[in-house]
A protein has these predicted regions:
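Non-catalytic interfacial helical region
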Residues: 2-131
Length: 131
């Protein structure tokens, strides 16, 4: 099962993702978190399954599209993650539209949380700040 969270409001997106993780966890699962700072070998190992004893896991993949090697492996593994019994959570704070659409195509749940746009400062001091 694949869950996808994205958007510029990272605090809200993370909060909603953590709520969903808490909802589906039964207490005995191990949480595996892979970020762009991990190695490709770590990511590959997380795709292999629960190991010798069939340990149930929740896998969180965070910001992998920032790392070029991991990005390629992520896109090649989407179908495998979609069919998996283990829940996979993908959190991408900022990703391009093509990557977002590709991940959404395989996701059972897609959630986007964008921060409200800030109004442009039209005050008299804006000119002084520009100098």
């Amino acid at each position: 099962m694949l869950y996808f969270y994205t958007g510029t409001d990272t605090k809200k997106a993370r909060g909603e993702m953590n709520k969903e993780i808490a909802r589906i966890s039964k207490g005995g699962e191990r949480v595996v978190r892979i970020t762009d700072a991990n190695s490709v070998a770590d990511f590959t190992a997380s795709l292999q399954g629960g190991g010798l004893f069939g340990e149930r896991r929740i896998v969180i993949l965070e910001g992998l599209s920032e790392n070029e090697e991991m990005r390629d492996l992520l896109f090649r593994s989407l179908a495998q993650m979609q069919k998996s019994e283990e829940p996979f959570f993908i959190f991408e704070p900022s990703t391009d539209a093509d990557a977002r659409r590709t991940i959404e195509k395989y996701s059972a749940s897609k959630n986007r949380f964008d921060a409200p746009k800030k109004e442009k400062d039209n005050s008299v001091f804006a000119l002084a700040n520009a100098l």
